[in-house]
């Protein structure tokens, strides 16, 4: 799916890590929320409250989940899951990484 229809978008951006990650919250009619964003080349650590599925829209990244030793690579069309109350490191090396974060 390349677009979301019939949604509400929060106009104020979520800006993290001095602008290296910028996203907007999208709310659906059923109350579910997602964020749509971009991560610029960097290595960042994110903490989760709810479980998340990170869908790669464009670009590529490497990810290391909390408690794991190996980095895994993801490209457009792939996704990875992060448990609730956890964290993950993400490395974006070249092109900006475009994503949709599915919560819950």
From Swiss-Prot:
Reactions the enzyme catalyzes: a purine D-ribonucleoside + phosphate = a purine nucleobase + alpha-D-ribose 1-phosphate; adenosine + phosphate = alpha-D-ribose 1-phosphate + adenine; cytidine + phosphate = cytosine + alpha-D-ribose 1-phosphate; guanosine + phosphate = alpha-D-ribose 1-phosphate + guanine
Pfam families to which the protein is assigned, alphabetical: Ppnp
UniProt keyword annotations, A-Z: Glycosyltransferase, Transferase
GO cellular component terms given for this protein: cytosol
Gene3D superfamilies (alphabetical): Jelly Rolls
A GO MF term: thymidine phosphorylase activity
EC number: 2.4.2.1, 2.4.2.2
InterPro entries documented for this protein: Ppnp (IPR009664), RmlC-like_jellyroll (IPR014710), RmlC_Cupin_sf (IPR011051)
Keyword Ribonucleoprotein: no
Similarity field: Belongs to the nucleoside phosphorylase PpnP family.
Role summary: Catalyzes the phosphorolysis of diverse nucleosides, yielding D-ribose 1-phosphate and the respective free bases. Can use uridine, adenosine, guanosine, cytidine, thymidine, inosine and xanthosine as substrates. Also catalyzes the reverse reactions.
PANTHER family: PYRIMIDINE/PURINE NUCLEOSIDE PHOSPHORYLASE (PTHR36540), PYRIMIDINE_PURINE NUCLEOSIDE PHOSPHORYLASE (PTHR36540:SF1)
Protein name according to UniProt: Pyrimidine/purine nucleoside phosphorylase
Organism: Thiobacillus denitrificans (strain ATCC 25259 / T1)
Originating gene: ppnP
């Amino acid at each position: 799916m390349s677009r979301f229809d019939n949604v509400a978008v929060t106009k104020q951006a979520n800006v993290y890590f001095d602008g290296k990650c910028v996203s907007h919250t999208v709310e659906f009619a059923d109350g579910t929320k997602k964020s749509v964003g971009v991560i610029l080349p960097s290595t960042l650590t994110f903490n989760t409250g709810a479980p998340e599925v990170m869908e790669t829209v464009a670009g590529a990244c490497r990810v290391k989940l909390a408690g794991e030793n190996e980095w895994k690579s993801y490209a457009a069309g792939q996704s990875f899951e992060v448990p609730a109350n956890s964290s993950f490191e993400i490395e974006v090396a070249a092109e900006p990484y475009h994503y949709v974060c599915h919560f819950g």
